[in-house]
Amino acid sequence: MHIPFLDLNKINLRFEEEFLQATQQIIRNGFFVLGEQVHTFESDLAEYIGCEHVIGVANGLDALTLIFRGYKELGLLQDGDEVIVPANTYIASILAITENGLTPRLIDPCPNTFNLDLIEENISEKTKAILH
């Protein structure tokens, strides 16, 4: 018996025409990076969430890398600081941490719930952030 986990075709079908039109517009105008669509997205999202600035990035790794870099620029994190992450995290989490000169500390999740029940007992003087 097949039980579908996530039927993206069904979910996206109602948006198909809009997706196709947007894709064609991007291809036609030739701006794949920093084009009008990115500017519109950033402006619309900033207004929607009620903040002054939004930066569109290519993926989650870029987003996490910029977040950690921002914390370092603000003096909230320094080279060598420890960041606790679940051991079963996606590699982008580790790459963003190490790219910024920080040290990942991998914590095994609870095998029954996948929660990080062991976080508290693994926090040390070097721990400055938890990415979960």
Residue ranges: model-predicted function:
Residues 1-31, 36:
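N-terminal "arm"/small-domain region of PLP-dependent enzymes with the aminotransferase-like
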Residues 5-7, 58, 131:
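Short beta-strand segments
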Residues 10, 40, 62, 115-120:
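An acidic, carboxylate-rich microenvironment
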Residues 20-24, 42-46, 68-69, 120, ...:
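Solvent-exposed, non-membrane alpha-helical residues enriched in polar/charged side chains
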Residues 31, 35-82, 96-100, 106:
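Phosphate-binding glycine-rich loop
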Residues 73-132:
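PLP-dependent aminotransferase-like
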